């Protein structure tokens, strides 16, 4: 019979629980603030995150639906639907991949770029307690 505990995993102590609680609290405050910023701009937080991940993919200016699904931790079909909603809103466009016809690249439109930069600037202003994001000079 199993006790429910996994072998090799120590139970957290009081200080660790306090640290986890503080982290979750700060994370939730940030997410709520992000929801407010995005909503005021007329987009959802998922749309903002998609725009951020398209532009924030290392080494290029686009991403595939599969890559976006991974970054969003979402199902590929749900991510494809989100891309379609962003495309209908004029924020992104799909382009066939020249080297792999099975892949479709998602690119920001000019409107999507403007929206992303505006929202990212507002988010960056609130990253103060997250110094690890930009280093000490980014806040």
Where are these regions (language model features)?
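N-terminal leader segment of winged-helix/HTH proteins
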Residues: 1-41, 89
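Pre-recognition alpha-helix immediately N-terminal to the DNA-recognition helix
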Residues: 22, 49-53, 114
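Residues within the DNA-recognition helix of helix-turn-helix
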Residues: 78, 82
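Charged, amphipathic alpha-helical coiled-coil/dimerization segments
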Residues: 5-7, 84-139
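Short, hydrophobic-biased segments on the C-terminal half of alpha helices
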Residues: 65, 83-84
């Amino acid at each position: 019979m199993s006790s429910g505990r996994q072998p090799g995993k120590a139970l957290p102590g009081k200080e660790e629980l306090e640290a986890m609680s503080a982290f979750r609290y700060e994370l939730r405050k940030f997410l709520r603030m992000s929801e407010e910023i995005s909503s005021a701009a007329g987009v959802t937080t998922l749309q903002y995150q998609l725009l951020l991940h398209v532009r924030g993919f290392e080494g290029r200016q686009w991403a595939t639906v599969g890559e976006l699904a991974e970054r969003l931790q979402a199902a590929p079909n749900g991510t494809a639907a989100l891309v379609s909603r962003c495309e209908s809103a004029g924020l992104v466009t799909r382009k066939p991949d020249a080297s792999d016809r099975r892949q479709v690249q998602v690119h920001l439109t000019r409107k999507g770029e403007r929206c992303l930069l505006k929202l990212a600037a507002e988010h960056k202003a609130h990253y103060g307690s997250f110094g690890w994001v930009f280093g000490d000079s980014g806040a």
